[in-house]
A protein has these predicted regions:
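Short nucleic-acid-contacting surface segments enriched for D/E, G, S/T with interspersed K/R
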Residues: 68-83
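OB-fold/S1-family single-stranded nucleic acid-binding modules
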Residues: 89-108
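A short, structural micro-pattern
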Residues: 38, 76-78, 93-95
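OB-fold ssDNA-binding interfaces and closely related basic DNA-contact patches used
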Residues: 1-55
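Acidic, gly/ser/pro-rich intrinsically disordered tails
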Residues: 1, 5, 106-112
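Short, structured beta-strand/loop micro-motifs enriched in basic residues and often containing a Trp
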Residues: 59-68
């Protein structure tokens, strides 16, 4: 059986490490993680409100918002602030908290 090594390091927990509306900071250029059930995603190390740093998955929607704000080169995102949005959504037939990420001045469509 072919297995892939999963991404190392501690991952953030929405609602514990940060809350809706918090401002975090991107600390690296990110890396692609194709483990898991929902396809490839970008993982960035971020600085949390308590000054700790942990890994955070950026979904495709979040990536698109950040590309609009900061450009297509993730190396240039290092040191940039991001705003986290925690939204209850139906995922795999159950309500779950989904984290979206934008630049601080951006709004999520439908969340104005």
């Amino acid at each position: 059986m072919h297995v892939k090594k999963s991404m190392g390091g501690q991952f953030v927990k929405a609602g514990q490490d940060f809350k809706d509306g918090d401002i975090l900071q991107i600390l690296d250029e990110g890396r692609l993680d194709d483990s898991g059930d929902f396809g490839p995603k970008m993982v960035f190390q971020v600085r949390l409100p308590n000054e700790e740093s942990k890994n955070l998955n950026f979904n495709k929607t979040s990536m698109n918002y950040l590309i609009d704000a900061y450009g297509e080169e993730t190396l240039e995102w290092k040191g940039k602030d991001i705003k986290v949005w925690i939204v209850k959504q139906m995922v795999s037939n159950k309500m779950t908290n989904v984290v979206y990420i934008t630049a601080p001045g951006q709004q999520i469509e439908g969340m104005e």
